[in-house]
A protein has these predicted regions:
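Donor nucleotide-sugar binding/catalytic pocket of nucleotide-sugar-dependent glycosyltransferases
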Residues: 135-176
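Short, well-ordered alpha-helical microsegments
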Residues: 13-16, 94-97, 148-149
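A short, histidine- and acid-enriched strand-loop-helix "catalytic/donor-clamping" loop
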Residues: 94, 108-126, 136-139, 143, ...
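Short N-terminal targeting/anchoring amphipathic segment
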Residues: 5, 75-94, 109
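A short helix->loop->beta-strand "cap" motif at the edges of active sites that frequently abuts
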Residues: 106-109, 158-159
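A short, charged, and often flexible helix/loop element on the N-terminal side
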Residues: 50-73, 88-89
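N-terminal subdomain of nucleotide-sugar transferases
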Residues: 1-58, 79
Length: 176
């Protein structure tokens, strides 16, 4: 069975369902950098627990609220384990940046998954920084056309972007 590792911020409901579905066909481990109880923008009722199909791992905070983000140094211990694929969700958190740099230094390929993004006018230094982060991935997972445009804008190679149908709608939710 294929083994896949995801690194993301917190267990949002649509992601939990996605990981549960994916875990029906492969061994899925998901590393979370943020705790649900620390989310101030969301009601606790918004979060759901998974169906138990994937393995959730709460990383330990080393530096809390670094630029309102967590830095979890224990991520590297998980990256040392053998996986068929490693997926970094997003590109800008301190833990994601640490993970990408660690993987690149060891020439371990990884995917970057992005679920949306807006192309804005920004200072050149900010654009170049974002571009340097996005370009670190070997391949990209995009949730749709606008995300693909965002990734290409920041240096992703279009031929290595994989668009996947991402939805939180289940067959049972569709009206007859």
């Amino acid at each position: 069975m294929k083994r896949v590792l995801f690194l993301t911020n917190y267990a949002s409901p649509y992601r939990v369902h996605f990981y549960d579905e994916l875990a029906k066909s492969m061994d899925v481990t998901v590393l979370f950098t943020d705790r649900v109880e620390d989310q101030k923008n969301r009601s606790a009722d918004w979060f759901v627990s998974g169906g138990g199909a994937y393995r959730p791992v709460q990383l330990k905070r080393c530096v809390a609220h670094l630029l309102d983000e967590n830095l979890c140094l224990d991520v590297t211990g998980w990256l040392k384990k053998p996986y068929d694929a490693i997926v970094i969700c997003g590109y800008s958190s301190p833990t994601a940046i640490l993970a990408m740099r660690w993987l690149r230094r060891r020439k371990i390929p990884f995917y970057m998954e992005v679920d949306g993004g807006l192309i804005r006018q920004e200072r050149k230094i900010k654009y170049l920084f974002k571009r340097s982060l996005v370009r670190k991935a070997d391949q990209w997972l995009s949730s749709g056309r606008y995300t693909t445009e965002f990734l290409v804008h920041y240096g992703a190679e279009k031929s290595r972007i994989h668009v996947y149908p991402f939805s939180s709608v289940f067959e049972k939710d569709i009206l007859p």
